[in-house]
Amino acid sequence: MRVAFSILLLVSINLWGAKRNPQPVIEKPFAPLEAARTMQVPEGFKVTLFAGEPDIRQPVGFCIDDRGRLWVAEANNYPDKEGGKRDRIVILEDTDGDGRHDKRIVFYDKLEYVSGVEVGFGGAWVMSIPNFYFIPDADYDGVPDGEPVVLLDGFGTHANSHTIANGFAWGPDGWLYGTHGITNWSLPGKPGTPKTKRRRFEGGAWRYHPVRHEWEAFATGTTNPWGVDWNEYGHAFVSNCVNPHLFHVIQGAHYEPDRNRPTGRFAYERIPTIADHLHFTNTKTIRAGIGTPEEDVAGGGHAHSGTMVYLGDNWPVKYRGDVFMNNIHGRRINHDRLSRNGSGYTASHAPDLMRAADPWFVGVTLAYGPDGGVYVSDFSETGECHHRHNTRKQTGRIYKITYGKPKPWRGDIGKLGSVELAKLQSHPNEWFVRHARRVLQERADSTLGQAAIQSELNHLLASSSDTIQRLRSLWVLHGIGELTAKRLAELLRDPDEHLRAWAIQLLCENKRPSGAVLDEFLRLAKSDESPVIRLYLASAMQRLPLVKRVPVLTALLARAEDATDANLPLMYWYATEPVVAADNKAAVQLLAACKLPKVRQFITRRMATKER
């Protein structure tokens, strides 16, 4: 996504089949209610207007809080990076359950260049470039308890207005995740950190821990990712504004395209998209097909925004676990279906979920709420992504897509008791699961109900036959600090590959696994039959000192069956490269053991390179 994603949409009221002939630009959007009424969705679905101008303008992102309210980031400055403090966060609430907001609070209106908002841990987390802020509001009454606190600065806008840091979403591991475009590389750090102690980040996925206040790159690459979400196994996915459109995000990975990123120059090859298709037709001139019948059939165009893995309980079950993203030029919501492929996934094209008739529709963010319905924000403007001036700042909408008659929900997850929150880990709507997990993490220092929830969750972790239920219990126990290294080590021998995999990741969170754990890693590297386990081991090795990586890497590189996997040879290489660069003896050992042709080539190439 590009933050303005403005689409130079030429008038073709024959929306889906027009030839791309020069036409005058549409000067006005459809009225908000008309725009919702004319959206095409499958039988049984309906689209309603949740909010529109003048109550909302230029919604570049939103999140949903524990009460089901939408906190919306309004990018009034876009694309003027020097426009002053005019961006704001607005809270919208539907108090009577009719599907329309009827209460509006301006939470904060002095932001510089906003691109994301999330709520939790007593306030709002806001990306307002060049700064990443925390705005305290302990009781979430919509009135800040104090001035914004700059957690990090150094986020870039030097190259253009759009490929910037954005987000956010709470991950299953208790970190706050965001995404970042390629051209506006950043040097994030706490205020006052000298440039020499900052690490350049050139785009991809990153995360920030809300308690320890640590920032780290999670994966690098893609072009301009916007939005991150997880499936039920805790595997992350991002959509990409510019071709290709969908990636399975693996910790420590480097993704295509290369684009001469200097910090990844020894990656040599990057992990490709998981999509087996494109949503556009001309790979040499990506805009050439916009508006043609062929492009319409393919999916609408090359630019995407927002990532949602649907895990709600309102839409039909056939949509559960599928990935949805806004298609900017196609004015629609694309739909990809995931299937396992070795250590990762393949994403296949499924019928579009929604098509908008309004030529100003610019979908940005997608998220399902407590009733399982999906909110879609519409930036509502024209122009084609890279424009330097935006005179159409008075519009913006948020729609809601539901199936049948969803049951309205009113409540406050934050006011539930800890035992009730633990029981919500069995809820069919992942919205409740995630919010309850985060609130329990916030209460980790409290003794209130801790013994009871530990008992409940440990019982589910030990005795449930449901992988998803066990993972949910695992993540909560980790978030509240009650998952011991001993228990995680025991899970390395669990019969379920997903429990073994997450045990590997969580044992390496502090980058200090014990010698006994490393021995278990070596056993898994040699003999575990699951490619998912080997993928998690490859990620984990990147978090360890070089000398401690060598035994496990030696075993992984000997797994000849992994040569054709889309992820494993490259992930093995990303963990191996620093060892080869630093230790010639270890490099020789790894080369001798390696049965993967691609990695053998990379080791030899790196050994011949003088630069260290």
Each predicted region: which residue ranges?
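Sec-dependent signal peptide recognition
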Residues: 1-8
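Hydrophobic h-region of N-terminal signal peptides that target proteins for export
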Residues: 8-17
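Beta-propeller domains with acidic blade repeats across secreted/periplasmic ectodomains
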Residues: 17-423, 431, 439-441, 484
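Long, ordered, helix-rich scaffold segments
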Residues: 377, 394, 401-612
